[in-house]
Amino acid sequence: MEFTFTLKYQLSTQAGGDDDMLDRLAVEGCDDAIVGLGQPGRLALAFIREACSANEAVASALAAVRRAVPGATLIEATPDLVGLTDMAEVVGMSRQGMRKLVSVHSISFPSPVHEGRASIWHLAEVLAWFQGKGGYSVSQGMLEVARVAMQVNIRKELDRISPESVALATAG
């Protein structure tokens, strides 16, 4: 099965030149990705990877990038965090239709990760809700890769905080 996802990185000063890095990425198995170097100090890889599972696809890509660009720090795996417009696009409806749906189903719709001027949700939770509702076309591959991207991002954030902070957050 093919899985589509993007990995975004902050480059270290040891990343080397762009041509050298592109060669290392290809040698390490990232030849199934479109590479973006438009922002100085950043690297984005948009993969379409063949694998038995989304977990295998993303894990193999993460390992390949780690080998090719050892000092790079993962910023984000996508698709994960989405706003109303992104959700609407994924399920094939208008932004206004999505806003109304979220409002009408405010009790059962997944809670946002961030609520403010622009709210953000985990795509995996939203797709699972749509799948449970029925009547909406949800790609199983998209749901699977969104779940894996969410897990990668949560793990990355947990690794950033101290054990004491984790204990405090989970106490109770």
Residue locations for each model-derived region?
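Conserved short beta-strand edge segments in small beta-sheet-based binding/regulatory domains
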Residues: D32-G38, A63-D80
